[in-house]
Amino acid sequence: MEKVKIYGDAVKNMPWKEKPEGFDGVVWRHDNNPIIDWNPTKKSARIFNSAVLPYEDGFIGVFRADHKNGRPQLHLGRSTDALNWDIEDEEIHWVDEQGNDYQPSYAYDPRLVKIEDTYYIVWCCDFGGAALGLGMTKDFKTFVRLENPFIPFNRNGVLFPRKVNDKFLLLSRPSDSGHTPFGDIFLSESPDLVHWGRHRRVMTKGGQGWWQGTKIGSGATPIETSEGWLMFYHGVSGTCNGFVYSMGAAILDKENPSKVLYRTRDYLLTPEKEYETTGFVPNVAFPCATLQDPETGRIAIYYGAADTYVAVAYAQVDELVKYIKENSELVDGDDVEYK
């Protein structure tokens, strides 16, 4: 297989650890996980399921912080090495497009992406039920809420890092108020981030992999590569001891991302370490963000662990893409090409 190219800017100072000797997987954990532990700020008991990006000479992050009253909000954080984070005590203050206060009653599971010169945040908020919130910032000082993309109920909203065929693209998972039925990933497009349509089912739960038999959800912002869009996602299995959240990956067609080219039959990472199996919600590995360096092919994956911690794992793009292609299983509906 030819060397896989990652498109984007170099990130030379991103975290990295070489694969442990004798390890036969393609995703391996950071030695000093978790990188964010219990009670990280005055207000919050737990931080997890959070998003990071390169910014200026370091890194910026939008973090899900579950406050000590149990209600989640989004907090801003900064770091010089993307491992040690200075997280603000107060939650992000939002305004509407006219500059009026527009604070969500709760906010969780953010995704963060830069498109051209603007940073966009997608999260889950209360909009007559759990729905996707959408906001923007140019400077991480003023945060403006835009129109909510969809009606309830919807979660796991992830914007692509550039327009495709001159349209913004958004992955999401429609559901009901219990957030478990349905369980498939959909793609929607918009010319202006206000009007959304051409909804397409991208990936379905199930198949031979029981680890993703209950539901799946898009994770980190898709990474543009020469092989297609590399997307990390979570898959959920139901057990007699509750849900188990594991990590998988798929490659979507570059020009028609509603079409799945390959997806992992087996999980890439599942809860095994104590910080993944024990916490506020046990047995969760929930990918939300990546850092990647085109020059080296290195990928750092940020994931929430046990709804309590932030953890990091690593992969090398050539090895990872090769593995996905050689260990792929499509589920009914994955390879449908909509007209």
Residue ranges and their predicted role:
Residues 1-105, 113-158, 162-214, 223-280, ...:
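Beta-rich carbohydrate-recognition and catalytic domains
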Residues 288, 292:
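C-terminal substrate/ligand-recognition segments
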Residues 220:
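Catalytic core of Fe(II)/2-oxoglutarate
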Residues 284:
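Aromatic sugar-binding surface patches on proteins
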